[in-house]
Amino acid sequence: MKIIQRSDGKFFATYTTRTKFGDWMAQNLFRTGMTLREVAGKLHVSRVTISEHLNGRHNPTFRDVVAYCWLFGNIDDPNDIYKLVKEES
């Protein structure tokens, strides 16, 4: 996982492997004390998908990475999720 700062000062993350992404996400879940249900509710995804991410069986998309970054405080405005996804695509 690599956190990158854009020219406007906002932060987002890139990832190299599914395992590293799962490790990073698991650490953040542990740090925040949130449950899978709470995270799923915030991101509007299923708990099964999150479990697959954590176990490295689900290949995260750029949208997933940005959404998790916003959830865990790396991005200030949720609208940046969509801006970053557009920039990447």
Explain the meaning of each model-derived region.
Residues H44-P60:
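Recognition helix of helix-turn-helix/homeodomain-like DNA-binding domains
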Residues N79-S89:
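Short amphipathic recognition helices of helix-turn-helix/homeodomain-type DNA-binding modules
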Residues M1-T35, K42:
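A short, Lys/Arg-rich alpha-helix, primarily the initiator
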Residues K42-V45, F72-G73:
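A short, basic/aromatic helix-end/turn motif that makes direct DNA contacts
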Residues L36, R47, F62-V65:
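Helix-turn-helix DNA-binding elements, focusing on the entry/boundary residues of the two helices
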Residues M25, V39-A40, I50-H53:
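Conserved hydrophobic/aromatic packing and binding residues within compact polymer-binding modules
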Residues R63-N79:
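DNA major-groove recognition helix of helix-turn-helix/homeodomain DNA-binding modules
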